[in-house]
């Protein structure tokens, strides 16, 4: 909490700048909190996006990259939106099989690539718990979100290395929006 409190002035400054950019003089309305400031014009097919995630994971840990590769090759992910499919994304862990299943509503944007990294982070976290007893595998949300947010950071930092100026704005805005979501939750 101390790190969040310490960085709140920067978050507030970002929100003031965003409000001004979007034309609001009296602060940013809640409904504009996650409004994009630039369009994400880069297309990331699931194949391209998931391979990018794997490549970035491998720069940190071959085990992490292998986990993501295994999940994709074994069709552990329900990737695309379709009629009557629930929205959002999540990771469901199947303890008895020592496996995870992933639900995405992948839309070919950078934010979808980050969502894949995030949820693979949840799955990898559970994989690392391995043969722990059930009592050791229940944890509070801040611990549960640590691995997933860390995986987002790995992929985001990797993406910045080769991004165009517009893509850099998309990546940084996505990072800030995710940080704001954590703070608001």
Where are these regions (language model features)?
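Active-site metal-coordination segments of metallo-dependent hydrolases
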Residues: 135-147, 178-182
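Long, amphipathic alpha-helical stalk/connector segments used for oligomerization, subunit docking
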Residues: 157-185
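Conserved helix-loop functional segments at active or binding sites
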Residues: 59-66, 92, 122, 126-133, ...
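Active-site recognition of the HExxH zinc-binding catalytic motif
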Residues: 107-127, 148
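Active-site-adjacent bridging/hinge elements
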Residues: 27-28, 89-99, 119-130, 165-166
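Contiguous, non-catalytic segments that form substrate-binding/exosite surfaces or channel walls
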Residues: 1-101
